[in-house]
UniProtKB/Swiss-Prot annotation:
Enzyme class: oxidoreductase
Recorded superkingdom: Bacteria
Binding site for substrate: 49-52, 106, 111-113, 117
Chain positions of site Important for activity: 96
Subunit structure, interactors included: Homodimer.
The name this protein goes by in its record: Glutamyl-tRNA reductase
Organism field: Teredinibacter turnerae (strain ATCC 39867 / T7901)
Active site: 50
Length: 415
């Protein structure tokens, strides 16, 4: 089995392709179990965010077979995924996972949310019972590296995230947010960050819409906002100058018709909308309306690029930490190989012991002399344990394999 990281991200695939293979939280456990039951992977975890879908697994299968599984499971185009995917094996897979968890492979360099998403990916796989020793150890090494990157570099300073970029873009369109109302759809971590950034910029009013009023109230309370249900959005939409949405819905929440009605009530006063969700919460056709500025996560890239430079020096140090992490991972894997070898050796020797002891017990019950039995048992065990190594040594000697002979001496402490 070998560690594999296979997936697509914002660098390799458009939003249209990414949303086709995005997994909602409710889908993940079913997908994890389905993949393991397919026989393609012994251990598996799936990371699915707005910017990437990645499969991490211990597998003996070809990457192409897992790519076909992903396409079939999500009813996506295998040809599209073929052009957009990447596959990393072994040490390269570990390096990739470390870079992802540290924020070095994110749309926003150094963004902190990805580590939490990676930990959630690990937790879901653990709860689903599809993690084994190999993938567990890989994740632990990944988390240790990401923690070092956060604590030993400035990669997380000067907050830059999709949420920050969305608010920065809003400021470019509405220079003063103190007179504006923002409608936030969702109540997750990204929306919480958006709310915090908007509050820091002095937004006049915040409205939080969510599928459950309880979650909306929890966020609204923290930011002195108004909490509403998703069903109430049409009523409140005309009051919103800014709409930012990030939910896990599999279907759009805002259509062109609903926005047209809101614009009429606003007397066509412009609306700024950012759809951070994958799949999208806002129908793309909404962007065709003359008085709407609609942006997606891909549109935020330009804003984000301007803020990358301050983190690039820190990223160099982070890559050095990742190099060290990969070396430690290699040592972990070698140690794990030794553990498996010792386990197999012990099972083999215990099987021989059990067989010989059973023979001795049978002879004892038949009235054999105990002292003679002990001598016979010890002789048989010695011969059985010596047979395979002795045969291998004779063969190595006849073939001139001196290094194996020297290794044998070292292994058994023979001078």
């Amino acid at each position: 089995m070998t560690l594999l990281a296979l997936g697509i991200n914002h660098n390799t695939a458009t939003l249209d392709v990414r949303e086709k293979v995005a997994f909602s939280p409710a889908e993940l456990e079913v997908a994890l179990c389905a993949l393991r039951e397919s026989g393609l992977a012994e251990e598996v975890a799936i990371l699915s965010t707005c910017n990437r879908t990645e499969i991490y697994c211990e597998t003996g299968a070809e990457a192409q077979h897992l790519l076909v599984w992903l396409a079939e499971h999500k009813a996506a185009s295998a040809q599209e995924l073929q052009h957009a995917h990447y596959a990393r094996w072994g040490d390269d897979a570990a390096r990739h996972m470390m870079a992802v968890a540290s924020g070095l492979d994110s749309l926003v360099l150094g963004e902190p949310q990805i580590l939490g998403q990676m930990k959630s990916c690990y937790a879901v796989a653990r709860e689903a019972g599809v993690l084994g020793r190999g993938l567990h150890d890989a994740f632990q090494r990944v988390f240790a590296v990401a923690k070092r990157v956060r604590s030993e570099t400035a990669i997380g300073e000067n907050p830059v995230s999709v949420a920050y970029a969305a608010v920065s873009l809003a400021q470019q369109i509405f220079s003063d947010l103190k007179q504006d109302t923002a409608l936030l759809i969702g109540a997750g971590e990204t929306i919480e960050l958006v709310a915090r950034h908007l509050k820091n910029q002095g937004i006049k009013k915040l409205i939080v819409a969510n599928r459950t009023l309880e979650n909306a109230h929890a966020l609204a309370k923290e930011f002195a906002a108004e909490a509403i249900l998703l069903a109430d959005i049409p009523e409140y939409l005309p009051t919103a100058d800014i709409v930012i949405s990030s939910t896990a819905s599999q279907l759009p929440l805002l259509g062109k018709g609903a926005v047209e009605v809101a614009l009429k009530k606003r007397k066509h006063k412009p609306m700024f909308m950012v759809d951070i969700a994958v799949p999208r919460d806002i129908e793309p056709q909404v962007g065709d309306l003359a008085d709407v500025y609609l942006f997606t996560v891909d549109d935020l890239k330009e804003v984000i690029d301007e803020n990358k430079k301050s983190r690039e020096e820190a990223a160099k140090t982070a890559r050095t930490i990742i190099d060290e992490g990969v070396e430690r991972y290699q040592l972990d894997q070698r140690a794990l190989s030794a553990v498996e070898l010792v386990k197999d050796f012990r099972q083999q020797t215990e099987a021989v012991r059990d067989q010989e002891v059973q023979k001795a017990l049978n002879a004892l019950r038949s009235g054999a002399d105990p002292e003679e039995l002990l001598l016979t048992l010890s002789r048989n065990l010695t011969n059985k344990f010596m047979h395979q190594p002795t045969t291998a040594l004779k063969r190595a000697s006849s073939e001139g394999r001196e290094q194996l002979l020297q290794d044998f001496k070292s292994l058994f402490g023979l001078d």
